[in-house]
Structures are given as C-alpha cells and as structure tokens.
C-alpha cells in the first residue's frame, strides 16, 4: 500500500542520511490491499501486463469455498490466483480476494522476492502448511497451475 511504501521510503532515506550509505533499496513488488468486504489484494504482474509483454505464463487458481478453514468460519467467497512463467515456474503475480486476502498475500510476496530457484511455484507444493488455514490456498492454486502444464 502507499502508506507502507512511504514508511519504508522514509526509513531508507533516514538511513542514507545518518549512515551516508544509500545502497539499500525497496522491494520491487509492493502489495496492494483494499479493505472492502470481501478484501482484495495483489502483488506483481497482472494477466494483461504479461500478455502485453508476451510472457509465456500459466495460471493456478484456488477457490476459497474448497478450503476447510473457509468452510469452518463460513467465509466461502473468494479465490487466490497465482501467475507463473510456464518454463522457469517463477512466480510473476498473485491476486486474491476474500477472507484475509490482504494478510495471506504476503506469503506469496515473500517467495516472489527470493532470487533464482527460491522463487518458483513448486515452493508451495513442497511446503507444509498449517491445516486448516486460508494459506492452504497457495498449495491448491500451485497444484492447479502445475497440472495445467500437462
């Protein structure tokens, strides 16, 4: 969000002034959150941007209504969408709406910021998530997306 980005920019500017070192930098992909009902959140590229850039991408989706946690709390509206490169499997964007969307977006953001093989959709397949949680949507979406490659 703009407030969070402005806070980080101010912190980095103060460090540069105090330490005389301006080598620190902000992350490239800053998440957005819209606190409506349901919440909307995203980080990274959109399908429209990837199509315009002619990037070969695939989409993995998870519907919240299929998650145990969403069923338990009665918040079945929502979904998580992961956009990833078809060849490298690098995560390019994550889009979410529904219960806790602005909170769970940071899980994907953390993986997107990893360099090299640390940023792949396979991370979500090979990671153990607490159950039942809304974060489980990442595994469901990752499996959905990888299955589309075959």
Swiss-Prot record:
Among the Pfam families in the record, one is Pyr_redox_dim
Entry keywords, A to Z: Cytoplasm, FAD, Flavoprotein, NAD, NADP, Oxidoreductase
**Cellular localization per UniProt:** Cytoplasm
Q: What is its EC number?
A: 1.6.1.1
Q: What is any one of the record's Gene Ontology cellular component terms?
A: cytosol
Q: Which cofactor does it need?
A: FAD
According to the UniProt record, what class of enzyme is this? oxidoreductase
Query: Which reaction(s) are listed as its catalytic activity?
Result: NAD(+) + NADPH = NADH + NADP(+)
GO biological process terms held by the UniProt record: 2-oxoglutarate metabolic process
What GO annotations for molecular function exist for this entry?
Answer: dihydrolipoyl dehydrogenase (NADH) activity; flavin adenine dinucleotide binding; NAD(P)+ transhydrogenase (Si-specific) activity
Q: How is the cofactor bound?
A: Binds 1 FAD per subunit.
Q: Which domain of life is it from?
A: Bacteria
Record's function text: Conversion of NADPH, generated by peripheral catabolic pathways, to NADH, which can enter the respiratory chain for energy generation.
Q: Which PANTHER family match?
A: DISULFIDE OXIDOREDUCTASE, SOLUBLE PYRIDINE NUCLEOTIDE TRANSHYDROGENASE
Report the sequence similarity comment from the record: Belongs to the class-I pyridine nucleotide-disulfide oxidoreductase family.
Q: What is this protein called?
A: Soluble pyridine nucleotide transhydrogenase
């Amino acid at each position: 969000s703009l407030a969070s980005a402005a806070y980080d920019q101010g912190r980095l500017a103060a460090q540069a002034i105090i330490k005389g070192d301006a080598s620190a930098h902000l992350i490239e992909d800053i998440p957005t959150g819209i606190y409506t009902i349901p919440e909307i959140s995203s980080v990274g590229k959109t399908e429209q941007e990837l199509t315009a850039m002619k990037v070969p991408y695939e989409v993995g989706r998870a519907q919240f209504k299929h998650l145990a946690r969403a069923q338990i709390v009665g918040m079945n509206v929502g979904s998580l969408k992961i956009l990833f490169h078809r060849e490298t499997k690098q995560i390019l964007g994550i889009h979410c709406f529904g219960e806790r969307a602005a909170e769970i977006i940071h899980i994907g953001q953390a993986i997107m910021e990893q360099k090299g093989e640390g940023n792949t959709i396979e991370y979500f397949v090979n990671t153990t998530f607490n159950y039942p949680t809304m974060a489980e949507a990442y595994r469901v979406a990752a499996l959905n997306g990888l299955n589309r490659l075959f």
